């Protein structure tokens, strides 16, 4: 199975917070999952913790390398830039990642949120999402119990799978 590709400064273990969530399900493919993630306007239709996505510079509706976009999640307005966008093809995992940021100074939060969608044998698909965070808000999130990032991302995965099954 494949791994997330981490940019310098966001390698897990060297940041203020990190979360990892994964599901492996039967009966879906990376190609069925991809449009639900790569089209930000789709996310609020199945995941309650995503709101008000929009693109800048007349881009969109799908993410591409370098495109700037905005959305709201976990109570944060998040400015974002897509830094990795590899659509699913046979024999290679789909990859999607963005750098997101919110706040300034002591309230600044920087994240690298990455997704890996990988077809497996026996009609299974693996969906891995990992997020590495820096800044005081990340430190607070790391110490919050129950962990809102782990729980929120698990909900996103579960809702993503349900939406893909419904779309079949």
Located regions from the model:
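A conserved amphipathic terminal alpha-helix motif
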Residues: 126-168
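Short Pro/Gly-enriched beta-strand edge/turn motifs at strand-loop
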Residues: 4-6, 62-65, 94-102
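Hydrophobic pocket/interface hotspot
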Residues: 32-37, 43, 69, 82, ...
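Hydrophobic-ligand binding "helix-grip"
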Residues: 45, 73-126, 132-134
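Short beta-edge strand/loop motif at the mouth of beta-sheet-based domains
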Residues: 21, 41-91
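Hydrophobic ligand-binding cavity/cleft-lining segments
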Residues: 1-60
């Amino acid at each position: 199975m494949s791994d997330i590709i981490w940019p310098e400064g966001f390698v897990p273990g060297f940041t203020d917070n990190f979360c990892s969530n994964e599901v492996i399900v039967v009966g879906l493919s990376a190609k069925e999952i991809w449009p639900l993630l790569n089209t930000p306007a789709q996310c609020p239709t199945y995941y309650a913790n995503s709101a008000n996505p929009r693109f800048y510079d007349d881009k969109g509706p799908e993410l591409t390398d370098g495109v700037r976009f905005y959305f709201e999640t976990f109570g944060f307005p998040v400015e974002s830039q897509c830094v990795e966008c590899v659509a699913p093809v046979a024999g290679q995992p789909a990859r999607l990642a963005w750098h997101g940021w919110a706040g300034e100074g002591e309230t600044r939060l920087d994240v690298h949120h990455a997704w890996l969608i990988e077809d497996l044998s026996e009609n299974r698909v693996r969906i891995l999402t990992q997020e590495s965070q820096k800044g005081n808000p990340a430190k607070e999130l790391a110490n919050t119990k129950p962990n809102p990032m782990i729980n929120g991302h698990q909900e996103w995965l579960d809702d993503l799978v349900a939406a893909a099954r419904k779309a079949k």
